Regions:
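Short, surface-exposed loop/turn motifs with a glycine/proline- and acidic-biased composition
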Residues: 444-479
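Boundary at the C-terminal end of the N-terminal hydrophobic targeting segment
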Residues: 17-26
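Residue-level detector of functionally pivotal "anchor" positions at catalytic/ligand-binding pockets or at interdomain
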Residues: 420-438, 443
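C-terminal tail/sorting-segment detector
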Residues: 1-3, 425, 469-485
Length: 485
């Protein structure tokens, strides 16, 4: 389908050249007499080889400044190998350099002028081809933005593969969206405190970037700002930040710890999803909502404290947090959304707050280690039949003493192996290892009082016998005497 669309565009695009387009030295232009400006446009015969766009052209004795490159101007010019763009160009239209597969050299003479170009999209920038970027015939690797620059436009350096370091001077106040996205060899960047705005996806896929200090004055970590910066190990977030946007740190797999300032009140969808190296993060007390998939697949996150002020956990917020051991859901939460703790395979204990009224499908599925669920709600929450799975047959449910009968009467709660009052402290849970079979539990006088099936070489024995009672546990042919403390 993509090939058919590309073929169709290749046929149609030459037809959209304006009737008054003129050819001057092999380049086609749309001329605007009223402003004496010229726009580079489509060549019906396609551009090939090395193209040098001049700063001005003359037609019928009138000089025109070349200020823009029109949409699709070099679209599908597969034999275009080099492009030189003058300082006079201030705008490049949509898809201007799409499918320029052989474009290996992009040449400019002024970084400040380049920073001010308005790019309509990623493929309006010739750097999207992956070619080398030259400033006055020298390949750009260590970039220093000139002091006279106050704003770096969106897409300005996207996909600049040669870029290894960037120094931004005081005086720059904004960095546009996607400005440095896909700069795969960028290892360091210095951002001054004068910067108060950094656009969405500005550093997406900068997978060699190891550390970054976000300047004071930034209030929002925007959507996708550091998505898939897989080498990022350190990020400093200033106290001015109040919001962590959607996918802000998605896929930052080398990030081990993050300190969020106290002023943060919102953590967006997938904000830290797939941060597989993250071991700890402190959520500020002012946060009221954790977005969908906010910590999904943070596979090394062993513990996390959800503040009391949180009232909403999004779908799959902690899905796949396979190292998480315990979780306490605060009383302000009323709904456990779909898959919120699914595939938390090390989770042994979960406390559900007293205000929870609804527990949706897969909330705790594939949590095979979950041994104790503490549900503080006196009114049995409306619970999907598949909120839990078969492990609850071996798990203890702890509920308010006045609600035990109600939980026993409702699915899926009644499927728990044991439902006990929260204030019953006589419950003892003991683990014994055994390769196969099951464990038999006998009273001291030899009466069989229970069994426990062995799963994954471990069996869980539950009793609520009075303190001081002795029992005998048989594992195969061996007997072990134990006492309830």
């Amino acid at each position: 389908m993509k090939k058919h669309i590309l073929s169709l565009l290749s046929v149609l695009l030459p037809m959209v050249v304006f009737a008054d387009a003129v050819e001057i030295d092999g380049i086609y232009y749309n001329l605007v007499p009223s402003t004496k400006e010229a726009e580079v446009t489509i060549n019906p015969n396609v551009y090939t080889g090395d193209v040098v766009i001049p700063a001005s052209v003359t037609c019928d004795g009138v000089d025109f400044s070349v200020t823009s490159i029109g949409s699709y101007s070099f679209f599908n010019c597969k034999s275009l190998t080099s492009i030189s763009i003058p300082n006079s160009v201030t705008k490049i239209g949509d898809m201007a350099f799409s499918y320029c597969n052989s474009l290996s050299s992009i040449r400019i003479s002024d970084i400040a002028a380049w920073c001010s170009i308005i790019f309509s999209g990623m493929e309006s920038n010739p750097l999207s081809s992956g070619g080398k970027f030259y400033l006055n015939d020298e390949e750009i690797k260590d970039l220093t933005i000139p002091n006279r620059v106050t704003s770096i436009g969106q897409f300005a350096f996207t996909n600049c593969k040669s870029l290894s370091s960037v120094t931004i001077p005081d005086g720059v106040t904004s960095i546009g969206g996607n400005t440095f996205s896909y700069c795969s060899n960028l290892t360091s960047i210095t951002i001054p405190n004068s910067v108060t705005s950094i656009g969405q996806f500005a550093f997406t896929d900068c997978n060699s970037l190891t550390s970054v200090i976000i300047p004071d004055g930034i209030t929002i970590i925007e959507f996708g700002l550091f998505t898939r910066c897989s080498s990022l190990t350190s990020v400093t977030i200033p106290n001015s930040v109040t919001k962590i946007g959607d996918s802000a740190f998605y896929g930052c797999s080398s990030l081990t710890t993050v300190t969020l300032p106290d002023g943060v009140s919102s953590i967006g969808k997938s904000a830290f999803s797939n941060c597989s190296g993250l071991t700890s993060i402190a959520i500020p007390d002012g946060v009221s909502e954790l977005g969908e998939m906010a910590f999904m697949y943070c596979s090394n996150l062993a513990s996390i404290k959800i503040p009391d002020g949180v009232t909403k956990l999004g779908e799959s917020t902690f899905h796949g947090c396979s190292s998480l051991i315990t979780i306490v859901i605060p009383n302000g939460v009323t709904v456990l959304e779909y898959g919120v703790f699914s595939q938390c395979r090390s989770l042994t204990s979960a406390t559900i707050g007293g205000s929870v009224k609804t527990i949706k499908k897969n909330s705790f599925t594939d949590c095979p280690a979950l041994a104790d669920v503490y549900c503080l709600a006196e009114n049995v929450p409306s619970t999907d039949l598949y909120a839990f799975d078969s492990y609850i047959l071996q798990a203890i449910l702890h509920v308010p003493s006045n609600a035990v009968d109600a939980y026993m009467a409702q699915e899926p709660w009644r499927f728990f192996q044991c439902i006990v009052p929260l204030d019953d402290e006589s419950i003892e849970t003991t683990y014994y290892t055994s390769p196969t079979g099951h464990i038999d539990i006998y009273s001291i006088d030899g009466k069989l009082i229970g069994t426990a099936a062995v799963q994954s070489e471990a069996a869980r024995i539950i009793n609520n016998l009075p303190s001081g009672t002795s029992t005998i546990v048989k594992k195969g042919g061996k007997s072990v005497k134990i006492m309830v403390k």
